[in-house]
Amino acid sequence: TVKFEGKLPKLPPLQITKSKEVCRNVPNETLIVGAGQGIRYAVVTLEGITKGVAVEKEAIHELDNLGCRFVPHVLAANVGQFVVFKNSDPILHTAHALFTSGQPQFNVGLYPGKVSRKPLVTPGVVKIICEVHPWMSAYIVVSEHPYYSVTDAYGEYLINDIPAGNYRLKVWHETLGTEE
């Protein structure tokens, strides 16, 4: 379980400046701490692993624009897999992907009801923003191996089929940073 320790910071409300008829009640998901101080949307990854189960290359992940937010807020995937960006809202959105280093990945416009499929070609943390609605963001953590998990509402995670060995556990969170 990934838990928060200390005094929980008060998150400011998101500044909804456009499309207010659709973009109501958008939560600030940059730090969600649930029951028992569990942190949601942290990505737990094994480091130093060189063998084990093969990456499922045909896997397709979905990131939806729904209620003027990206759902899910954080996802993890492998190099070689795909993300389908979907727009379930009745307004235009974009999915502009940048590595946290600032290096661009792609930028697609998503009209209502449209989808766009993009490959994940480089490992790292990718921030997704909507250029039309600047409060919208999500993250994709792209790994070269399948030994990772995104924490749930209780801060819990599960990584299956770990081969015997000694590994480091790395935890990444958009607000709290990285811990090993």
Where are these regions (language model features)?
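Extracytoplasmic copper-binding redox domains, predominantly the cupredoxin/blue-copper superfamily
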Residues: 2-180
